[in-house]
Regions:
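Generic structural signal for residues in well-ordered beta-strands
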Residues: 59-64, 97
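Short cysteine-rich clusters marking metal-coordination/redox-active sites
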Residues: 73-76, 89-92
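Short microdomains enriched in Cys/His and/or Lys/Arg
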Residues: 91-113
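Cys/His-rich microdomains that often coordinate metals
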Residues: 79-80, 96
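Long, charged N-terminal interaction/targeting segments
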Residues: 1-59
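Short loop/turn motifs enriched for small/polar and acidic residues
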Residues: 32-36, 65-69, 110
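Flanking scaffold residues of small Cys/His-coordinated metal-binding clusters
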Residues: 67-68, 83-84, 102
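Cys/His-enriched microdomains
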Residues: 71, 87, 105
Length: 113
């Protein structure tokens, strides 16, 4: 379960942000997780509960923003929802491998106090 190592790193980075701000603890963390990132939001939440124990983030909340995958059709010059990195444009039926969103796995913000 790679979500544990992902969240361990997120906690480390959040605590680094708190130290840089001169704050004693992390009070919240917002993540952006793409539907094609390979990370499972429920597993990230479980891992969060495990890895934040006995850290300055022990009482912090976690918010996960799901980012749906979107591809770009060069022929139509339009973005469309897609299931994977190679999908058929619903307008012109050309296939596109130009994935614009969906692979995100990033810290959107850290709240400290």
């Amino acid at each position: 379960m790679h979500e544990v190592s992902i969240m361990a790193e997120a906690v480390r980075l959040a605590m680094e942000s708190a130290r840089a701000a001169g704050a004693p603890r992390v009070t919240g963390l917002r993540l952006r997780v793409g539907s094609l990132s390979g990370a499972v939001p429920e597993a990230l939440r479980f891992a969060w509960d495990v890895v934040r124990c006995e850290t300055p983030a022990a009482e912090a909340w976690l918010e996960i923003e799901s980012v749906p995958a979107a591809c770009w059709c060069a022929k139509c010059r339009a973005e469309f929802a897609c299931e994977n990195g190679l999908s058929e444009c619903p307008r012109c039926h050309e296939f596109s491998g130009d994935l614009r969103r969906g692979r995100e796995l990033e810290i959107a913000s850290v709240e400290v106090n």
